[in-house]
Amino acid sequence: MKIMSKLNDQQQFRRDKLKNLVKNGFNFPSSTFEHDNLVEINEKFSQKSKEFFLENQVKIAFAGRLIRQRGPFFIIFSQNLQFQAYISKEFQKKNEFIFANLDLGDIIEVSGYLFKTQTGQLSIKVNNFSLLTKSLHPLPDQYYGIENPDEKYRKRYLDLLVNSESAKTFRLRSKIISLIRTFFDSQGFLEVDTPVLQPVLGGASAKPFITYYNSLSQNFYLRIATELPLKKLLVAGFDRVYEIGKIFRNEGFDSTHNPEFTSIEFYQAYANLEKIMDQTENLFRFLFEKLNLDPANFDFSNKKINFLEKFARYDMIEITSKLMNFDLKSANFADLVEKAKKEGVKIEPFFKKGHLINKFFEKFVEPTLINPTFIIGHPIEISPLAKSNPNNPNFTLRAELFICGKEFANMFDELNDPIDQLSRFQAQIIEKNQGNQEASEIDNEFVQALEYGMPPAGGCGIGIDRLTMLLTKNESIREVILFPQLKPKKD
């Protein structure tokens, strides 16, 4: 097995320096000072005059990574900013051994007094210096960054060090998740955690990852949704719940899909589909406001998107019929099969009328939905957890939110009739036996929970990765996931 590729000259020089340091007692020491907050230091002292620091001694200490050096001036990256340290020639000569073995990329700790340079830059004049960590590899160029995209994702730690835009994206992602929590917490929702390992496949239509639970001698699934356990909590009297967590779907990855992703699902007792659509729309507006984004003229994927106006709402079968110039309502299954063949739509053995209507929607309508649009009224065959429409039982009280041709949210008027739910699960088993690998299984424990009585409720799921793509204006999901899944690297 290959342990390490051949070292280049720079790597060998650094290892030789580390050997010298170790011989003289260096052992990757712990930090020794209480560190100051550099953001606060900048805010408090950056506008002070040079004379202020001659009259007032302000001592600070901090640690960070050495990223540039110009004579006695050392630029240290710490606490998400760059701070300049002045280390006199006399101090360097006094500590000649350490500085002779110092390289860019090393992590150092300094303390000393603040002063202003001739150009007015706030700096620290160092009187204590420690090497904390020796870097054995040179950092990528600060200007060019990591040019190979695959290497950028594999070595995200380097990308974040040298690419300020990447670092900004992930700090913003964290803020987005925090704001989502604020939005729901302020409305009395309770954040909960439900199991990642599930004995029964359900809550969505997706291929699962399967693992083996040794102590139970049983296969388990990594969850494909959090829906069913959250709805059990509605039965338990928790009227407003949400969960932010990882979801796993054993499917392909592309610019908008990753097999492991983060979602939020929220459920509200006594809310109908209209209320949940309004709630989702309000969440988007809340995020735009708190992130200081322009909702009326938002640029994404070379398109102008208007989030200020009320989101459009269209019935699925009506808009699909219109854009296809084909009456889906009056067509029978044979008509739809014939139309599918003409349009190059693949027909699976388990397809019924509703499956084909959905495929036509995906082909003819979905790519055209640029501004935020709710599509309402999905076929019952593809919506086993949503209430059927009392005025048209072949369709459901379900909606999806589309932006820029992509799905961003999926919401239901939740099915709470246990008899109907069991029947839907049984229909899913028939589909599975006919080859639908994404069909759900019968979750008898969930059905039994419904038998105790679940209040009428609405619920919604939103992919946080795709939402972050939108709000940070990134067109690849890999840009908003710290360590995205990649194909194995070839030797």
Curated annotation (Swiss-Prot):
InterPro entries: Aa-tRNA-synt_II, aa-tRNA-synth_II, aa-tRNA-synth_II/BPL/LPL, Lys-tRNA-ligase_II, Lys-tRNA-ligase_II_N, Lys-tRNA-synth_II_C, NA-bd_OB-fold. It comes from Mesomycoplasma hyopneumoniae (strain J / ATCC 25934 / NCTC 10110). The keyword Ligase applies. Mg(2+) 1 binds at E400, E407. It is found in: Cytoplasm. It catalyses: tRNA(Lys) + L-lysine + ATP = L-lysyl-tRNA(Lys) + AMP + diphosphate. Pfam families: tRNA-synt_2. Its cofactor is Mg(2+). This is Lysine--tRNA ligase. Mg(2+) 2 binds at E407. Belongs to the class-II aminoacyl-tRNA synthetase family. The gene is lysS. GO terms for biological process: lysyl-tRNA aminoacylation.
